[in-house]
Design a protein with these regions (language model features):
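Noncatalytic, solvent-exposed loop/strand surfaces
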Residues: 1-200
Length: 200
């Protein structure tokens, strides 16, 4: 493709976020590319500060940033109050290192997240620490949160979500065919939801 200028691998990348990477491929949903970022793993750290692995979406044709979803809610955002002691300002590591899944027909992308810093201790970050160890459904067009479920509140056992959620249709007694999503966890449990509404 002719970009009209020399290729710059850092163009459009918010470098102020610090040390961040990705361990799984992005997912393309209709005209949007969604990237699940991950930060340095908390259990390898000697510090409590870290960068959140916010979810980024780009236009698949132009490469322009479409939206960003804060995995650690900022002031005024849903779930901000779950980060007590102002821990939202300096802790991080909530990200999606596992692959994402999507329902293109309904313009939804599903984000399985990991724990907040540090994996095995959270005394400095009281509260439920949303969206750590959660499954989040986002509108691929806007980045709006449609629903979420937090598997482990205030996660300190490294029980994050290690796999892409599985989309399937279930025949449920009394409900008929239900568009479902199943998330495998390190708890040895599988959580299943209506993938449109988030109802368990």
């Amino acid at each position: 493709a002719d970009l009209g200028h020399p290729y710059d691998p850092y163009e459009g990348i918010p470098l102020e976020t610090g040390y961040i990477t990705t361990s799984s491929p992005p997912i393309v949903v209709n005209d949007t590319i969604v990237v699940g970022n991950s930060a340095e793993q908390g259990y390898l750290q000697a510090r409590v500060e870290n960068v959140p692995g916010d979810i980024l979406a780009y236009d698949k044709t132009t490469g322009a940033l479409k939206w960003k979803f804060n995995v650690i809610p900022q002031p005024g955002e849903y779930g901000h109050e779950t980060w007590e002691n102002d821990a939202w300002e300096w802790t991080g590591d909530v990200s999606s290192w596992a692959p994402l899944s999507a329902d293109p027909e309904n313009n939804l992308v599903y984000i399985p997240t990991n724990s907040a810093t540090i994996d095995y201790y959270g005394g400095f970050r009281p509260g439920d620490n949303l969206y750590g160890a959660a499954l989040i459904a986002l509108d691929t067009r806007t980045g709006e949160r449609k629903w979420h479920f937090q598997m482990v509140k205030h996660e300190i056992w490294n029980f994050d979500n290690p796999t892409a959620p599985v989309l399937l249709d279930l025949d449920m007694p009394g409900r008929g065919k239900v568009p479902a999503i199943a998330q495998i966890t390190k708890q040895a449990w599988v959580y299943a939801f209506d993938r449109i509404t988030g109802e368990p």
